[in-house]
From Swiss-Prot:
Free-text domain note: Consists of three domains; the N-terminal catalytic domain, the editing domain and the C-terminal C-Ala domain. The editing domain removes incorrectly charged amino acids, while the C-Ala domain, along with tRNA(Ala), serves as a bridge to cooperatively bring together the editing and aminoacylation centers thus stimulating deacylation of misacylated tRNAs.
Function per UniProt: Catalyzes the attachment of alanine to tRNA(Ala) in a two-step reaction: alanine is first activated by ATP to form Ala-AMP and then transferred to the acceptor end of tRNA(Ala). Also edits incorrectly charged Ser-tRNA(Ala) and Gly-tRNA(Ala) via its editing domain.
Keyword Acetylation attached: no
Organism: Leptospira interrogans serogroup Icterohaemorrhagiae serovar copenhageni (strain Fiocruz L1-130)
Top-rank lineage group of the source organism: Bacteria
Protein name per the record: Alanine--tRNA ligase
NCBIfam families membership: alaS
Disordered: region residues: 512-535
Keywords: Aminoacyl-tRNA synthetase, ATP-binding, Cytoplasm, Ligase, Metal-binding, Nucleotide-binding, Protein biosynthesis, RNA-binding, tRNA-binding, Zinc
Necessary cofactors: Zn(2+)
Taxonomic lineage from the root: Bacteria, Pseudomonadati, Spirochaetota, Spirochaetia, Leptospirales
GO molecular function annotation: alanine-tRNA ligase activity; aminoacyl-tRNA deacylase activity; ATP binding; tRNA binding; zinc ion binding
Amino acid sequence: MKPKSVSEIREIFLNYFKDKSHNVVPSSSLLPAGDPTLLFTTAGMVQFKPLFTGAVELPYTRATSCQKCLRTTDLEVVGKTERHCTFFEMLGNFSFGNYFKEEAIEYALDCSVNHFGFDKNKIWVTVYTDDDEAEKIWLSKGIPKERITRLGKKDNFWGPAGDSGACGPCSELYLDRGIEKGGPNCATSGTCKPGCDCDRFLEFWNIVFNQFNQDTEGNLHPLKQTGIDTGSGLERVALLLQEVDSVYDTNELRKIISFYEELSGISYEDKTLSEISEKKNNNQQISSQVRNETKSIQDSRKTAFRVVTDHIRSVLFSIGDGIYPDRTGRGYVIRRLIRRATLFGRKLNFKEPFLYKLVDKVIEIYKARYPELQRNAAAITKTILVEEELFLKTLELGLEKIESLVQKTKAGGKTIFSGADAFLLYGTYGFPAEMTEEIVAEQGLDFDKKGFQEELEKDRQFSRESWKVNKVSLMTGLNVDKTEFLGYSSVSGKGNITHLFYNSPKSSNSLSQVDSKLQSSTPAGTGSYDSKQVSSLKEGQAGAIVLNKTPFYPEGGGQVGDIGFLRQGKNVFKVFDTQKENDSIIHFGEVLSGEFIVSQELEAEVEITRRERLKFHHSGTHLLNGALRTLLGDHVLQKGSIVSPEYLRFDFSHPSSLTSEEIRQIESWVNESIRKNFPVETKELSIEDAKKTGAVATFGEKYGERVRVVQMGDASIEFCGGTHVSRTGEIGYFFIKKESSPGAGNRRIEGVCGPAVIETFQNRFSELTESVQNLNLKIKSELGEEGTKILILSFIPGPDEIREKLEKEGASAVSFFRDLSENIATKIEENTSSFLKIKKNLAERDFENNTSVIENVLASSVDTGIGKIVSAIFEDKDPNSLKGLSDNLKVREKNLLVILGSRNSENASIVITCSSELTLKGIHCGNLIKTACELLGGKGGGRPDMAQGGGKEKQNLESAIAGVINEAKQILTGERV
């Protein structure tokens, strides 16, 4: 069999099905669009789920793709087996109501034998237990009955991907790799065939006959149209065609391993055994024990090479698709992969960050097929480096933790390291189970694999549940027709009441979701409530009204719900919030006057000013998203947003904080788009047509068959159901108030648009004015003439000047006011520092020259007959102040030894000086200071006539000074004190 490269195999497959009239569809992101039930894209069919179920109009009936996939279900064995990877490419061909079993089997066999070059006589197949039809087709294609195996649901019923979707029985192709690949009993038992746990038969092609749609409850329903979903692992096919032992020996993965060999200086094909041989006497045999130990080292290093090779691909492709390391969800999986690779890297002598160093080389292998990697290379490299550095800071803590857990286990007289402790290390410190097992084995402990697996399964279940759509109904049993939304073109309109709900004081029933909503959105009353459907609502009652038509926008897409009034004559209902449940728009509020009954026609009036501000901020959010993707790169993905009347908040994926210059560029880009006054155009399109426009979708959102697309010239095009301005010029201006981080791998921008920009600058300059006035007042009152030079005399605009300049100059005034406010704020900070410094200098000068202080210190003098010794302790005085006071004391008194100390909140300092006469009598201040500093737990030194020092043991300051006095007395008098 002629070996073929991975890229050649990929092209052979895609071209084969292209020639069979299949649409070649690019790989979708690893972040599953519109399917929150999946952490990652795990199969080629994920992007086609709506086509299989008939949820959308078919753009084609045949497709083929090579899909990026990520699965971590077998993470613990990755690197140890020949075929397991977390990241892999899945070749696939798909039929949506077009061909079925006959053609799918024909294509699989033809491509495998006549295009890949597999020996037909070595191909075995499996079919589902009762799938006689599939077996009959295989027989007709020349596969003998003895090479056809029937397997049950566990092996031959596939799907769905996620909690719901298309699924059905499947048929798999295996290649017989020879009896030598079998297990110890395979050669003699005669039962070895597909389904055996050995490595003899390797599955390389799976044909799923999609006949059912599984709902979220696990029930199967016949599909309106049958389909074909094929999966063929590219790495596995390469393993077989290149006739190597594992997927890690295929050309692309082996190349990545070679990068790590070069970086580590260790060979993947470990030479440890031969090295030991050379060290031995030529005639001396290597013992069995040495061989076993050496083999263990070889296997350990080989596993480490495979783990880092697999994980760098997974991490690199994930970050390239906007999945950043995080504390929860899919981001946590990526973080765990980085940490696992870092740990295994220690077996290859990597003690410092190393994964990031090879990002560019790995991208070089894949960039032709996946250009997004090259575009996001800088972000990928930086993110991985940051994560490695972060983990290395906690790694030593983890190793200390495992040591303490081992000691705790032994102290309790146990010989088994518990699964719960192992999972603690796994989840908190990122320690893989196998590494924990190795470490505890070195300490003579067994490892509780079962207990660990139980804890792991609990965690997996929690992870799965946390990603399911867990939507609690606002109105239990609410089943009404769709509310027609009028709000795109109007802020008022008429609608008839279809449902009324009243929240009465809570009975013994549990509090429903609507009660929580009503309590949070109405000011009336306190305590708990129960909600019930009623035929009328009366004055003073809080509740909810559902209309058949309304201009009120329900909270969604980050935009908060509208408020306003529902009226009919003297009947008035104040709306505090608007929400959506299924297709019904619900108005929450309180009856201010009159009575409301079902079927009544109401006049609905949205609060106009608030809606306008929402439009400014929602359109501004789209422009901000466009700016970020244009200036920072396509790796930027929306992670969350809030659109309120007061401000906008936008969370996005990005590995590092933004520089001041980047913030200015983003702000200028948005303001330039506002100035260009682009028309804001909206279209309702099929999901497929919408994707063709290049519109940006919010990953994780689930879209219906038809979506609304909002375009703003060439600045932005997004899927969006919110309310917007007609032209970007209406926004007026945009200003970034704050940039921060909501979590690892993500950044957050808070900004304002339109009138909110005016108000923001008015408030900001008002605060600056107050700060300047307060500082100037302090400077004048506390420094007098000394402070004249640091008075702030900057021009600060008033509210009217700010409004006039912004309204006259528009977006260009934003930069002016940003720079001015930052300059004034900097000036305040600098001059406050100068004020405190001058104030301190004046205080020190006053202290040094204070007659009362000098007199008090001199009054405490000790006369030795040869000279006097004075000492004192102060609070919060620096050494310079103490030196200044010492000099003034020596002016007042001859033959004087001065010992002064000071304490602050952290440490103590001490200064020793003496008159020149005393140095002739044997006093050496530099020696005396060492006596003091020993007690203070610090250091010091100096000349015979002056020395200084200090230490952290401030409580010993009195003892330190007393020790110096005693030593000085002994020197001067010759008497031991």
